[in-house]
Amino acid sequence: MVELRQFSDLPIALSGISRIADPSPPPPVVAIRRRFKGGGNTRRIVFSVPLIFAFPFPTGTPKDVLVGIAAVFDGHSGSEASEMASQLLLDYFALHIYFLLDATFSKELTGKLPNSLMHLYDLDSQRFQDSLPLNFHLDILKEALLRAIYDIDATFTKEASTRKLDSGSTATIALIADGQLLVASIGDSKALLCSERYETPEEAKATLIKLYRERKRNQDSSPSRFSDLKLEHRTGLMRFIAKELTKDHHPDREDEMLRVKAAGGYVTKWAGVPRVNGQLAVSRSIGDLTYRSYGVISAPEVMDWQPLVANDSYLVVSSDGIFEKLEVQDACDRLWEVKNQTSFGAGVPSYCSISLADCLVNTAFEKGSMDNMAAVVVPLKSNLDWESQPKEQSVGPSGFKMKNTYALPCEFLSSQPNLFRMG
C-alpha cells in the first residue's frame, strides 16, 4: 500500500478522490513563489508541490519520504498541451508510484520495473525488504516520473488527434527527495542551481565592479555606495554561482539536428531562431503532432539523482522567456543581491521584496524580454520540521491515504483556476 500525503491548499483528484485541505492559512514564511507575465493564446503554467510517500525500507516499517516537485510547462500554438500536462502530472506520478510498488510486492507485474530491481522479485516479503537497495525509493520515483511523462504525452496525443489540436508544450520537472535532486526536461524551459562559492578579494572586486556598472546603467546605485561595498568585502566574498541543470532542445543542437534530418525534416532559421521545418523552435515537446514524423520527440532528457550539498542555496525552474535577456548567472546574481540586501539593499528593486520569483520575472521584463515568463524559486536551506506540524487524514475508496498539512510553506499563484486557487 502506498501512502500519499498532500501539502497544499489546492484540490487534487486522485483515482476518484478529491481532497481540499483545511482553509486555514499557511505559515507566514514563504518558501516557494512563482509569477507570470505576458498573454496571448499560450499558457506558462508553473507549480511546486511537496508530497509525502511511504516507502518500504529494510527496517520492516514504511518510511515517509518527502518529495518536492517543481514544474514549468511552457505552451505554444495554443494552451491545450500545457494545461493538460499540468493537470495530469501529479495524478499520474502518484499512480505510477502505487503501480510500481504494488507490482513489486504482489509479483503481478503489468509492466517492467527498472532493471536494477528485477532480481528482487523472487524473494519473499521479509527477504525482499531486507534486500532493498538504499536508493530503492529513488529508483521508483524516477521511473514513476518517466512513466507519467510518457502517459501525459500519450493522453494528449489521443486528444489532439481527435480535436485536431496543433499545440505543444515544454516540460521541465524537478524532484527533490532525501537531499537529492533529479531533473527531467523536454524543450527549452530551464532548471538551474544557485550555489554559494567563496571568491578571493580579486574575484570579489571584479564581481562588485560588474554589479556597480549594472546598477549605474539602471540608475539605482552611487559611487559612494560602491566604496562602502569594497570595504565590506575586502577579505573576499561569498557569491552565488549558477549551474545549469538542463540542455535546451533546440533543433540546431548537433544531436537534435541529426535526429530531425534522419526523420526527413530540416532545420532553418526564421526571425533569427533555428526551427524544425522553418516553424517549430524546439526539437522535443509534449504534443506538436504535426512534427512527430520529422524527428520531434517527447522523450525527456534526465539529469539523474545527484546529492544537494550545503552550499546549494536556490533551485530555479523557469520558462525560456526569463533568459531571453538574462544569462543564468545574472539570475543567481540577482538572488544573491536579494539575500545580501543588508549590504546591497539600496540597489535591489522594490518588487524583489515581494518574492524571489517576482524578482526574476520583473528583472527579465525590465531588461526587455518580450516573451511570456514564469518561474519557480525553491530555497534549499530551509530547516522546517514538517513532522511537528498538525496533520489531518482522509481515506478514500481506492485505499490511498492523503494527509494535509502546512508543514512546508508554499504559496500558489497560477493562471489555472481548476487546479490552483488564488488567495
Swiss-Prot record:
Gene Ontology MF, one: protein serine/threonine phosphatase activity
Cofactor note: Binds 2 magnesium or manganese ions per subunit.
Enzyme Commission code(s) on record: 3.1.3.16
CDD domains referenced in this protein's UniProt entry, alphabetically: PP2Cc
CC cofactor: Mg(2+); Mn(2+)
InterPro entries on file: PP2C, PPM-type-like_dom_sf, PPM-type_phosphatase-like_dom
Keywords: Hydrolase, Magnesium, Manganese, Metal-binding, Protein phosphatase
Magnesium is among the record's keywords: yes
Positions that bind Mn(2+) 2: 74, 320, 371
Annotated ranges, domain PPM-type phosphatase: 52-380
Binding site for Mn(2+) 1: 74-75
Catalytic activity: O-phospho-L-seryl-[protein] + H2O = L-seryl-[protein] + phosphate; O-phospho-L-threonyl-[protein] + H2O = L-threonyl-[protein] + phosphate
Gene3D superfamilies: PPM-type phosphatase domain
Family: Belongs to the PP2C family.
Protein name: Putative protein phosphatase 2C 50
Source species taxonomy: Eukaryota, Viridiplantae, Streptophyta, Embryophyta, Tracheophyta
